[in-house]
Swiss-Prot record:
InterPro entries to which the protein is assigned, alphabetical: Ribosomal_bS6, Ribosomal_bS6_CS, Ribosomal_bS6_sf, Ribosomal_S6_plastid/chlpt, Transl_elong_EF1B/ribsomal_bS6
One GO process term, biological-process aspect: translation
Role summary: Binds together with bS18 to 16S ribosomal RNA.
Identification of the protein by name: Small ribosomal subunit protein bS6
HAMAP family: Ribosomal_bS6 (MF_00360)
Xref: PANTHER family: MITOCHONDRIAL 28S RIBOSOMAL PROTEIN S6, SMALL RIBOSOMAL SUBUNIT PROTEIN BS6M
Gene Ontology MF terms in the entry: small ribosomal subunit rRNA binding; structural constituent of ribosome
Length: 96
């Protein structure tokens, strides 16, 4: 299994208190495949470097997880299908 870090930018109109529960729905796919979610860090609302879908701000969240590559690809696919998610970035990190 490999370590990954996923940066997610969500729609700023979403309530920040609902970010973690809504991300848990997507992260359940990682847990079902035998991976584990190590940390979910919600940074809150921040200004974007450039507008995305005519939005100047976004809610940033960083998720650290350990899973197989096919699991993280499925997670990224599901996140990109959701309208409330503006952008995602998946990075493979070094083992801890």
């Amino acid at each position: 299994m490999r370590h990954y870090e996923v940066m997610i930018i969500l729609d700023p109109n979403q309530d920040e208190r609902t970010v973690t529960p809504s991300l848990d729905k997507f992260l359940e796919a990682i847990r079902k495949d035998g991976g584990k979610v190590e940390k979910v860090d919600v940074w809150g609302k921040r200004r974007l470097a450039y507008p995305i879908n005519k939005k100047e701000e976004g809610i940033y969240a960083v998720v650290e997880l350990e899973c197989e590559s096919h699991s993280v690809l499925e997670l990224d696919r599901r996140l990109n299908l959701n309208d409330s998610i503006l952008r995602t970035k998946v990075l493979r990190t070094d083992s801890k």
